Amino acid sequence: MAALIGWLARPLSQRPDQLRSSLADLLDHDSTVGSSVVPKVPPGADHVPLEIRVGLVSQSPITAFRPGPNVLCRYQHGDVIPAQELMKRIASSPQDEIHCSGGPVQINQKHYQGDVSLLKGQGDWLPVVSLDLETYVASVVGAEMPSSCHGEALKAQAVAARSYAMAHLARPATTAYHLGDTTRWQVFAGEQSTTPASRSATRETRGIILSYSGGIVESLYASNAQVIAEAHGHLGHSMSQSGAQQLAHQGLPFNAILGRYYAGASLARLTWHDQ
């Protein structure tokens, strides 16, 4: 089994009393594609509602903030901020926190679902959006790969994006958010990059992650093999998005595509564990 440098073996749960992943060895050793073992797709399970916090690094500084009609924004101490006063308060407040909930918001030119916190430190305000993991994955899939790509390639991307996100749930980038929204992590563009195709790929792989030796795979990926060699070569195995598209057109399902790029990994599905 390949030595996978840069892959994590971290606890899956923010709530270890409830959340477990079915991390048994799910490799199908009788099914191979070339020299690659095809990971077996785990059985279906109910949706596991996990929240992820994304730092909207690309949207700082905030030049426009428009809450939806049902959104309520408050300072950390509880005082409500009228919608028409928000940008004035953002421009004038020295250091504070603003929390908005109750519906979608527009930040600069992009729309986001979920609760939004505006954090002010020594520099510009940083928006942090808190949303369901699966909603997040659907946006990442649409931002990282064109929706015109083959459905199986998009499913492989969904699993890779979910696994990467889970690794950062276990090991957050900062105390304020789990990961950012740029290529430094994986691209997240809110509603702008969420499409019917990205939703379908996310739904059809709901809760599936890559696992290795009982831990989460920090599933690195890049647009093509050259970028992988230049950027990820020292970190272990990575998925080529253009290569995944080619393999999908050759007839490989998403799990076989993942088996090609993450040798030795198995697929597991997030489930609740009742005590």
Range-by-range predicted roles:
Residues 1-275:
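Conserved, single-site charged/polar hotspot
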